[in-house]
Amino acid sequence: RLEKNGVVLKSDTFSLNVPAGESKTMKLTLHKIDSAGEYVYHVSAVTADQTLWADAGHEIAFAQEVFEVKDNQIPETTLQKPTIVYGDVIIGVHGENFSMMFDKKEGGISSLKYNDFEYITRTPKVSFWRAMTDNDTGASEPYNLAQWYAAGKFAKYKTVSWLEQEDALKITFTYQAACIPTFEFTVTYTAHFDGKLGVCVNYAGVSGMPDMPVLALDFKMKKQLCNFRYYGLGPDENYSDRCKGARLGLWKSTAKENLSGYLNPQECGNRTGVRTLSVHDDMQHGLTFQKASAPFEMSVLPYSAYELENAMHLDELPSVRYTWVRIAAKQMGVGGDDSWGAPVH
């Protein structure tokens, strides 16, 4: 079948009779492609008849070929400049049906509203830490990587700067990591005058630190924003070293369903290759995260990485009060060569 941005445009079924150990080439009639977007040719091999080992229609293999058609047209838009307020503590951007407030004391965005609905409860925080897995613990990673825990969680907010552009307001917050050797990193918010918000975390790298578990931005959102759908690799959780069996498509789940029932709470629910992610409540109030250039990794859970880290068992987790959305540039894999010393690849 042919898909565009996860939506099936055309599908077809044909039969093959290929003896074991041989191969055969089939000619496909391809759908005409005349618009920009990401396209996927998806081929799935299923059993034609019921056998002793599988029912008819059982998938035994699949493959996907992904390609993109660029849109070279530059849209002509006339933007009405929103009201920008520069206060002692708050910088506010107020436009038609949206408002954004940036806190110079807190060090980030403190309010994001669309149609008077508030989406965040606290300034998003950069995190370099994940809740350690059983494999991580077996490889002594909590000890080896401990500096990354403090680096993000206890980072010191230092300065803020801003630049008003023709069609956006760019605000950059600078932090100093709580580790030795220390380093600075920035979070830049670009408040576009059409209501979109661009976010960029910049980490230049530092020598003398162990491998980084994750580079992510954590959003603490309202509890009712617990449903999510995304276009990326799925349908189940997957990681950089556990994604070969995942397929690109449109998937949906909830924060509760995304929490794995491990005896010892730990990192779970990650997705790789994500192009877009929409988090919404039952009334369809929603916020969409979209890739800027490269696909990202993400998770939507009822607990933060630090809450999962602190609990020894599931019943020690607190009552659900928020939905935690993690947008990550990259996270290390989960390993599995063994659980008593082998690090992740």
Could you say what each language-model-derived stretch is?
Residues 2-46, 50-56:
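Intrinsically disordered, low-complexity Pro/Gly/Ser/Thr-rich segments with frequent PxxP/GP/PP motifs
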Residues 50-76:
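Short beta-strand elements
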Residues 29-36, 66-345:
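Beta-strand/loop-rich accessory regions of lumenal/periplasmic or secreted enzymes
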